[in-house]
Amino acid sequence: MQDPNKLRPFFENVEFNREGSNMILNFGPQHPSAHGQLKLVLEVDGEKIIKARPGIGYMHRGVEKMAENMIYQEFVPVTDRVDYIAAGSNNYGFCATVEKLCGIDVPRRAQIIRTMLLELNRIASHLLFLGTHALDIGAMTVFLYTFREREYVLDLIEKYSGARLTHHNVKIGGMFVDLPDGWLDELLAFCEKFPRDIADYEALLDTNRIWLLRTQNVGVITKEQALSCGCSGVMLRASGYKWDIRKEEPYLIYDELDFDVPYAEAGDCYARYKCYVQEMRESVKILTQCVPLYKASEPKILADSPEFVSAGKEQLMSQNYSLMQHFVLITQGLKPPEGEIYLATESPKGELGFYIYSVGESSPYRLKIRCPSFWHCAIYEEIMPGQYIADVTAIIGSSNIILGEVDR
C-alpha cells in the first residue's frame, strides 16, 4: 500500500493511519468536479472519509507580487484573473480601494452603473454555480437551463464592455463609457423573465428525491465552525449568521436600495443552494431599482481628480493641459499618498478584500487580496470526515470555490 506519510513535509502536521483497512485516496487535481486544480488527500475506511486534507497551489501565478511591479492602472485587468467567473467584482474591489486611498469621489452615474454590473456578475456567477453543482450530482437538465440564462447575462455584459469573461469594465475614478442605447431595455426584459426561470430551476430540483438525498444533512457547517474558519457570503449565511457587507457596511448605492439578505439555519449543501437561488431573486430586485436611478442621474462617469484620473476623450482632444496630464498618468502612473488601507466588498462568493500599503509611488509596496474561496477551501478538513466519498463532489460544489481565488 502507498505510504501517505511520504507527502511530508507537504502535509507537515498530518499523520495518516497505515494500520487496518484504511485507504488513501487522491481526489484531483484533474478531477472534473474539482472546480479547477484542487487536490484532496482522503483517508477512507470503506466509503467513509476519516480524514481530508486539501492540497492547493496548482494555479498559483504570483498575482500579489505582480502588483508590486505594475502601476496601479496596469494591475486592474490582472484582477480579472483572480475570480474569473465574476471578474467585475475584482475590478471594482481593487479600484474602490485605490479610490478610497486617493480620496477620489466617483460620480453618481458611475456608481449606479457599477452596481448594475456587479449584480449581473453575481447572477452570472450564481448560475454557473447552480448548473455545475447540479451536474456534479447528476442533474444535467438544470445545467442546460442555467447556461441558457447565463448567455443572456454575458451578452449584456459584452454589449457594455466588449468582453464576456474578463471584463475590465471598471477604471480607477469611474467608468470607461456610459451605457449603450437600448441596454436598459434589454436589462428590464431580462429582469421580467428571469424570476420565472428561477422557479423552473427550483421545480426541477426541490421535487427531485435524489437531489434532496444528496444535499440535505450533507456537509453541515455550524455557525461556530463558519465563524472560526473565516467563512463569508453564502457559506456563512447558510449556517445561520446573517451578514452581508452590502447591508452592514454599504458601498456604492446599496444603502438606497430595498433588498433582503437570504439566510438559513441548517448549514448543509441544500441550505447553501437555497440561499444562492434566493440571492438571484434579490439581484433582480436591485437591478430593477437601479434603472430609474440611472435615468435621473447626471450623465457624468469620471471623477474630477486630474491628479489621479484622466479626463474624458472629448476633453483630451480639446484641452492641452488635460492631454499632458493624461500622458503623465499613463507613462508614470498615479501616485496615491502614503498610507495603508483595507476595503472589503461582497463578491458573489463572500468577502473580497484588498489591502494596499502605499509609500507614495506609482506601484503598491504591498498588495494583499483576501479571497473568500481560500477560506472556504480550508474548511473541508473540518466537515468532510464522517461523510461518504460520493458526498465530496456535493460539498465542493456547494462551497462554490474558484481555484483562481484560492491560489492567486
Swiss-Prot record:
It holds the Pfam family Complex1_49kDa. Its main location: membrane. It is found in: Cell inner membrane. Gene3D superfamilies: Cytochrome-c3 Hydrogenase, chain B. GO terms for molecular function: NAD binding; NADH:ubiquinone reductase (non-electrogenic) activity; quinone binding. It is a peripheral membrane protein. Keywords: Cell inner membrane, Cell membrane, Membrane, NAD, Quinone, Translocase, Transport, Ubiquinone. Its EC number is 7.1.1.-. It catalyses: a quinone + NADH + 5 H(+)(in) = a quinol + NAD(+) + 4 H(+)(out). Disulfide bonds: none annotated. GO terms for cellular component: plasma membrane. NDH-1 is composed of 14 different subunits. Subunits NuoB, C, D, E, F, and G constitute the peripheral sector of the complex. PANTHER family: NADH DEHYDROGENASE [UBIQUINONE] IRON-SULFUR PROTEIN 2, MITOCHONDRIAL, NADH-UBIQUINONE OXIDOREDUCTASE 49 KDA SUBUNIT. NDH-1 shuttles electrons from NADH, via FMN and iron-sulfur (Fe-S) centers, to quinones in the respiratory chain. The immediate electron acceptor for the enzyme in this species is believed to be ubiquinone. Couples the redox reaction to proton translocation (for every two electrons transferred, four hydrogen ions are translocated across the cytoplasmic membrane), and thus conserves the redox energy in a proton gradient. This is NADH-quinone oxidoreductase subunit D. It comes from Campylobacter hominis (strain ATCC BAA-381 / DSM 21671 / CCUG 45161 / LMG 19568 / NCTC 13146 / CH001A). The gene is nuoD.
